[in-house]
Amino acid sequence: MNYTRRNAIKTIVAFGALAPTHLHSQTKKLSPNSKLNIASVGVGGKGWDDMRAVSDHGKRHNIVAICDIDQRNGGEQPPNLSGGQSRRALGAGAARKMFPKAGVYEDFRLMLERKDIDAITVTTADHMHATIAITAMELGKHVYVQKPLTQTIHESRVMRQVAAKTGVVTQMGNQGHSTVNYRCAVDVMRSGIVGKIREVHAWTSSPSWKQGIARPDGSDPIPKGVNWDLWIGVAEPRPYLKHTYHNFNWRGWQEFGTGALGDMGCHIIDPAVWSLELGSPTSVVAEVTGVAKETYPKASTVHYRFPATAHTAGKLDLYWHDGGNRVPKEYAGIVGRNSNGSLFIGEKGNVVLAHGSGIPRLYPSEEFLDYSRTTLKGLYAKYAAEKLDHYRVWTDAILNGKQANSHFDYAAPLNETVMVGTIAQRLPGRMLKWSAPVLSFDDAEASAMVRRRYRKGWEIDALKG
């Protein structure tokens, strides 16, 4: 990756001299009682949550470096942020106050030259995940990467390979993977209580940002404290526009984000992939509304077909719904008003799983009353007592020389499945056959979307070819 010291010296650095870049042959050995030195890349919005949670507010581990292209304290918040999102929209200014001893950077490349960093969190726009995480892994640093793991299928495959080669401890930020309700769901589905699964529906109320829109004309002044060129990163340059890309609204743009499916799919499709032990899909087709050239559609239903497993009644159909699209009407009564969740249709009954909290609900409820009151209640109590925390799973794994539970051997294939669907959304109405071993569709235009182009000067060797 090419960058100049003359440009990089503008980066705010509040922590001594920089060490020369070098490739670690192995990760640093740590004792189980060590305090990790963690660096956070992207500290606004969800990055604020990740930084605090992974360090337990600085009590368990050290935040030694803060990196963000936006050095303001929260900056300009888009008007479409909900109350919860708005409360999280704290940026580098707030991070500096919480961790006053941490070095502060705009450019992750300079930050990663420090020898004292054990691990990093990556909570940036999707298009930068792979470049940052791969660079860190090749330097022997453990990585926690927010979902989606990467923006493209090819990046997911490479991330998995680099993780295996370097031996670092990895975790994708699909926090639901550690929750009681998702863990219970795995046991329920594999128990056979509702028979083998014939069909799955997964849905979200997202997007809460704009999709299905054209690129606006014009530009706005770049705010003081924002390094717009670094935010663009691997993408092709374009003018800054207030409330259009940074912050938050980048999710709807194909150049920077992955739409509602990319944002929520690694959460909500996870229980199906996990519990049913699904491999790669073999085909996908999307029906969409609100199509635009550069953004994801306003609403979609994506139909995946998976090969049979021991837990499915033959080949499995999985449907993803977003933008207000919902499950078929005959199931509307049992899914209720859950804004995000999944429905498993079995041979003997159905399971509804709300995303985020609660417990799996089995239907017809009267037929599964004894199971719900005894076995399921016991499972819930067992997992609740463990108090599993997704962030601590990762940090404990680093200290104990183990792997986390959403490590890249699991998370990368899950992310590939999600990104197969985002490609279908961009080519609506086409039945696409997917061959995971060779990273190719039976459609040239779709296959071209498996990889992305990287701006000159931002290429890294691992992602070439």
Predicted feature residues:
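Contiguous beta-strand/loop segments that form the cofactor/metal-binding neighborhood of enzyme cores
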Residues: 184, 196, 201-205, 210-409, ...
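Short, solvent-exposed turn/loop segments enriched in Gly/Ser/Thr/Pro and often Arg
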Residues: 70-73, 105, 123-129, 149-151, ...
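Redox-cofactor-proximal catalytic regions of oxidoreductases
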Residues: 58, 177-178, 240
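A contiguous active-site-proximal alpha/beta segment in oxidoreductase catalytic domains
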Residues: 142-144, 149-225
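Structural recognition of the beta-strand scaffold that forms the well-ordered cores
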Residues: 37-41, 63-68, 121-122, 144-145, ...
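N-terminal glycine-/serine-/threonine-rich beta1-alpha1-beta2 phosphate-ribose binding loop
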Residues: 1-142, 157-169, 465
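Extracytoplasmic/secreted proteins, especially bacterial periplasmic and envelope-associated proteins
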Residues: 49, 86, 90, 107-110, ...
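Residue-level signal for alpha-helix termini/capping positions
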Residues: 113-116, 137-138, 164, 190, ...
